[in-house]
């Protein structure tokens, strides 16, 4: 998404897809050790036999080594966290060929520098991740899902802030704006009100998911939410969430033949409404079609800028929207990227976001990879 794998200067691309063995499953300790080429779906298929699952879900069936290298996230990060919170340890091949192990199987440690988190999200610039030790979780006894439309964006976001503050353990909470809802209605033959809409998912016991759903229904009613449709039946849950699952393809269908440029800023959740509103004004003034989806529980949202890549004017307009959005998010105390990473695409914003600490990152890169052979030109520019 940000040019992570593009060989800007040529080079050797390492394919780890054949390193796809699940090496250890430890049900009692709720951890596993896998090779880098194991995919998320492959792991969860095996874990299900033990009544377990790995929750981080970026959408695609990504490899776990790739998810570690990019610091991947997903729709259920609001409850289970991102890859950073779920990695216990790594095996990494360093630029000089040395093999190192970081972390371990203990759930906490105050020993030494946290090299595991340093490699997580490094995008291959510090070493090659070959094995990953992960936390896993017990499969929930029950699920429920719900959908609710709001008169205003502010009401939708404020309801989520209240839900989180009240301690309701929501597993997923996703936001679609009016443009995106209109798109999924047309694409998936649905009939949702074309208003800011929240999609919820709850995990737990049969009793607890009902309690969570009822608690959320009470809270959203206080913030101008419409009817809260929810169900504990799997088929009905799938129907309720179809709009969110189809969002990308529905968005692309708004302008057939064009390309989609996804943005990825993340801001403090109390600034989310303001950031989205200012961004929508910017988009409307340019005339670009750009549906919005968001992981509203952690302040991360995505525009899908629909542009003709053969048009220099349209590309310049899209670039301007993205540039202003990133700077707006950073000014609000947020980040240029909540989950897509830096690659080469977000390099121009690193100094603005990190200030003096950018030089420390540069020194880390040079200490680990003095010859700059590991994915050069990504994450940090060392000149």
Language model features by range: what are they?
Residues 137-138, 144, 149-152, 157-321, ...:
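C-terminal substrate-recognition/cap domain of FAD-linked oxidoreductases
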Residues 21-174, 374:
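FAD-binding subdomain of flavoenzyme oxidoreductases
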Residues 27-30, 310, 344-352:
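Short beta-alpha connecting loops at secondary-structure transitions
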Residues 295, 335-342, 376-379:
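Short acidic/histidine-rich active-site segments
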Residues 1-19, 36, 295-296, 329:
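Glycine-rich N-terminal segment of FAD-binding domains in flavoprotein oxidoreductases
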Residues 98, 347-383:
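Activity-critical C-terminal alpha-helical subdomain
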Residues 124, 303, 369:
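Conserved, mostly hydrophobic/aromatic
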Residues 1-5, 12-16, 125-133, 206-216, ...:
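Short, acidic (Asp/Glu-rich) active-site segment that either coordinates a divalent metal cofactor
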């Amino acid at each position: 998404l940000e040019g992570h794998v593009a060989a800007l200067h040529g080079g050797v691309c390492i394919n780890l897809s054949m390193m796809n063995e699940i090496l250890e499953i430890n049900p009692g300790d709720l951890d596993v050790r896998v090779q880098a080429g194991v995919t998320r779906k492959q792991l969860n298929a095996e874990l299900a036999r033990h009544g377990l699952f790995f929750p981080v879900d970026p959408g695609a069936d990504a490899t776990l080594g790739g998810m570690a290298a990019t610091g991947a996230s997903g729709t259920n990060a609001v409850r289970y966290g991102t890859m950073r919170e779920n990695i216990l340890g790594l095996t990494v091949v360093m630029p000089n060929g040395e093999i190192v192990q970081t972390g371990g199987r203990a759930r906490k440690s105050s020993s030494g520098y946290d090299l595991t988190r340093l490699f997580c999200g490094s995008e291959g610039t510090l070493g090659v991740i070959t094995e990953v030790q992960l936390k896993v979780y017990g499969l929930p006894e029950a699920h429920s899902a719900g959908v609710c439309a709001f008169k205003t964006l502010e009401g939708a976001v404020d309801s989520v802030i209240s839900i989180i503050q009240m301690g309701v353990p929501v597993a997923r909470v996703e936001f679609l704006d009016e443009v995106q809802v209109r798109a999924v209605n047309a694409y998936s033959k649905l009939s949702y009100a074309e208003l800011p809409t929240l999609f919820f998912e709850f995990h737990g016991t049969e009793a607890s998911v009902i309690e969570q759903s009822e608690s959320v229904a009470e809270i959203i009613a206080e913030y101008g939410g419409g009817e809260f449709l929810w169900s504990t039946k799997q088929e009905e849950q799938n129907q309720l969430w179809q709009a969110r699952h189809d969002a990308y393809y529905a968005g692309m269908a708004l302008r057939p033949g064009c390309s989609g440029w996804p943005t990825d800023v993340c801001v403090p959740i109390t600034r989310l409404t303001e950031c989205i509103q200012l961004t929508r004004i910017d988009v409307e003034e340019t005339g670009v079609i750009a549906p919005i989806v968001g992981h509203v529980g952690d302040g991360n949202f995505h525009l899908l800028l629909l542009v003709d890549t053969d048009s220099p004017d349209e590309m310049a307009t899209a670039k301007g929207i993205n540039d202003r959005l990133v700077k707006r998010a950073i000014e609000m105390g947020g980040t240029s990227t909540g989950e897509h990473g830096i690659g080469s695409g977000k390099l121009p914003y690193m100094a603005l976001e990190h200030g003096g600490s950018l030089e420390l990152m540069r020194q880390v890169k040079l200490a680990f990879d003095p010859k700059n052979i590991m994915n050069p030109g990504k994450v940090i520019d060392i000149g």
